[in-house]
């Protein structure tokens, strides 16, 4: 319905039925049509009378039936109700005080309410010469009356009521009756004239505050806005703002800070425009130095050291051609030894690459594609040996470390040149010392060493003496005591010193070598105590010396556990011996105190 207070046909039917003391009944008779456009038929029974009607919804059909029933029904109608008397003379829900506030804001005059003291009750003194009146037992209190003074501009109104709010409403009603017919006062002509002049002389797109800042910036004057005063009720505030530009100052007042600031700027603009015009000074042209080119022309070595995948993508982008397409062709091998084959396609060129993982295979495929396209290989700038995984004799994985890592404390690195200098100095210090030492075959094949129960102290002492002076009096004494042929140990290589110590103490030394691009790696094992060491050098003897030096250093600090029973050195390659030794260690767990961490700490290069 247009008016929400207007009653609907169904509501009127209910009133008619209530007046005649009958019950209206609505029945849904039929429902037809598609789901999106149904038509409902509703029947209304009001006493003995029946009406039917249709609609697009049940509610609309009910309203249509009720409308037809109201028009055709012969039942007596209820008398119309008289409208309720509105005690409030003010139409709507707006109170007189709110309406007066709106009118006062339009007029630009604040409405101020002040409470007044009530009138004093008159006191009549009785004459004491006559007989007193009958004293009433119950006295009804005199109702208290509140008074409020209302000031709107130059007009004053007095309101009274039983409460302070009623007195305010009474005063507001009197003010509304007096001010409704009065015209709204116009603003002072000075402000309008100043505003017109300012708009004519200044740019219309700029405010007065912006113009003040522009003039102050040109004349290098400071600008400061300050709110001096804030007065008036909360709904009708009045602000007084002062603006200072150098030696000039002005004030502006308004019902908001923005308006007072604007009026203050408008006032001071008149003073700033009276200043003399500044002379025009041409600014010198600023010459900017051209930045040097940081990107140099690429030489023939450009791209070396880069990731081949990124390099290949950059080449295709520079050619404005399609980027390389990578695809995994196959995956083969055991679960822990996978081998992936990746294919890269650039235009009509196709290459493949293999690797232990997809990343390495993709890199190798990109490297092969670069070589096929005629570019140089993307060799790294710094040759860093790849990490090599190898199974130790005890079944544990032992990785050859990278040369770029730091050396552990206590591990000494000696190059072949240093070894030669040390050897020369030792030869000078010990004349007549033999330059050669018997090899492993000469130490007796098929027979045990002369001593089967070496002590930890003897091993550490002999190792220290060999490291310091190149000879070991303790070892010579043990040889004489055992009635074995004396084996002198002069200033020889660390690998020969270690073999001499192994012959004296009765343990076996085994080397396993592997070659990389420019270096040799040695995996040294002392059996059956299962102590492992590593060495890296430019040649096999140098890598052997590195590993042996690390072993001597470790033995000089910790010694060697006793060896149970003689050791028989078998003929054959080092790989065969390693396999047989691995079978022995699997069947008999070692009681050596040397763990994987000890082996890791004993590496020659970390």
UniProtKB/Swiss-Prot annotation:
Key words, A-Z: Microtubule, Repeat, RNA-binding, Transport
Organism superkingdom: Eukaryota
Basic and acidic residues composition bias: residue spans: 192-205
Positions of the UniProt region annotated as Disordered: 57-97, 177-205, 580-606
GO CC aspect terms: cytoplasmic stress granule; dendrite cytoplasm; microtubule; neuron projection; neuronal cell body; plasma membrane
One Pfam family linked to the record: dsrm
SMART domains referenced in this protein's UniProt entry, alphabetically: DSRM
Listed InterPro entries: DRBM-containing_protein, dsRBD_dom, STAU2_DSRM_1, STAU2_DSRM_2, STAU2_DSRM_3, STAU2_DSRM_4, Staufen_C
Keyword Transport annotated: yes
Annotated domain remarks: The DRBM 3 domain appears to be the major RNA-binding determinant.
Main function: RNA-binding protein required for the microtubule-dependent transport of RNAs within polarized cell types.
Protein name (Swiss-Prot/TrEMBL): Double-stranded RNA-binding protein Staufen homolog 2
Gene: stau2
């Amino acid at each position: 319905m247009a008016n929400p207070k207007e009653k609907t046909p169904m509501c009127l039917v209910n009133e008619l039925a209530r007046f005649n003391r009958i019950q209206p009944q609505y029945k849904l008779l039929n429902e037809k049509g598609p789901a999106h456009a149904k038509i409902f038929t509703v029947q209304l029974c009001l006493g003995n009378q029946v009406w039917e009607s249709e609609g697009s919804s049940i509610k609309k059909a009910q309203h249509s039936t009720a409308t037809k029933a109201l028009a055709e029904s012969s039942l007596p109608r209820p008398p119309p109700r008289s409208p309720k008397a509105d005690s409030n003379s003010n139409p709507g829900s707006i109170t007189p005080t709110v309406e007066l506030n709106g009118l006062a804001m339009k007029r630009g005059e604040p409405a101020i309410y002040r409470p007044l003291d009530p009138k004093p009750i008159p006191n009549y003194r009785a004459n004491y010469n006559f007989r007193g009146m009958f004293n009433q037992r119950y006295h009804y209190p005199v109702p208290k009356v509140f008074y409020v003074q209302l000031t709107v501009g130059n007009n004053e109104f007095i309101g009274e009521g039983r409460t302070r709010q009623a007195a305010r409403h009474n005063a507001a009603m009197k003010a509304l009756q007096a001010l409704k017919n009065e015209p709204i006062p116009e603003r002072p002509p000075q402000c309008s004239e100043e505003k017109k002049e300012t708009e004519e002389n200044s740019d219309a797109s700029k405010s007065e505050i912006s113009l003040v800042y522009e003039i102050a910036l040109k004349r290098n004057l400071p600008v400061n806005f300050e709110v001096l005063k804030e007065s008036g009720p909360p709904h009708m505030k009045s602000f007084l703002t002062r603006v200072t530009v150098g030696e000039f100052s002005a004030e502006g007042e308004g019902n908001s800070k923005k308006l007072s600031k604007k009026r203050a700027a408008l006032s001071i603009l008149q003073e700033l425009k009276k200043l003399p015009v500044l002379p025009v000074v041409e600014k010198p042209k600023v010459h900017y130095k051209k930045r040097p080119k940081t990107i140099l022309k690429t030489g023939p070595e450009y791209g070396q050291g880069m990731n081949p995948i990124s390099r290949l993508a950059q080449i295709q982008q520079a050619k404005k051609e399609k980027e390389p397409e990578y695809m995994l062709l196959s995956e083969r091998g055991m679960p822990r030894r996978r081998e992936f084959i990746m294919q890269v396609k650039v235009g009509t060129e196709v290459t493949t690459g293999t690797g232990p993982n997809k990343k390495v295979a993709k890199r190798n495929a990109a490297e092969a594609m670069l070589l096929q396209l005629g570019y140089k290989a993307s060799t790294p700038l710094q040759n860093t040996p790849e990490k090599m995984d190898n199974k130790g004799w005890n079944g544990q994985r032992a990785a050859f470390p990278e040369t770029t890592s730091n050396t552990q404390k206590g591990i000494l690195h000696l190059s072949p040149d240093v070894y030669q200098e040390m050897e020369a100095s030792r030869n000078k210090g010990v004349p007549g010392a033999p330059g050669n030492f018997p090899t492993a075959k000469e130490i007796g094949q098929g027979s045990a060493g002369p001593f089967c129960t070496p002590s930890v102290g003897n091993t550490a002492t002999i190792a220290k003496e060999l490291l310091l002076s190149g000879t070991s009096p303790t070892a010579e004494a043990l040889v004489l005591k055992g009635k074995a042929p004396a084996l002198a140990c002069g200033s020889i290589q660390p690998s020969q010193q270690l073999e001499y110590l192994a012959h004296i103490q009765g343990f076996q030394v085994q080397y396993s070598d592997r070659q990389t691009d420019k270096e040799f790696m040695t995996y040294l094992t002392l059996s059956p105590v299962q102590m492992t060491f590593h060495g890296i050098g430019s040649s096999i003897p140098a890598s052997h010396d590195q590993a042996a030096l690390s072993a001597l250093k470790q033995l000089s600090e910790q010694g060697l556990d006793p060896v149970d029973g003689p050791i028989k050195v078998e003929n054959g390659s080092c790989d065969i011996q390693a396999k047989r030794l691995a079978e022995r260690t699997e069947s008999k767990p070692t009681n050596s105190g040397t763990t994987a961490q000890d082996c890791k700490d004993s590496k020659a290069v970390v």
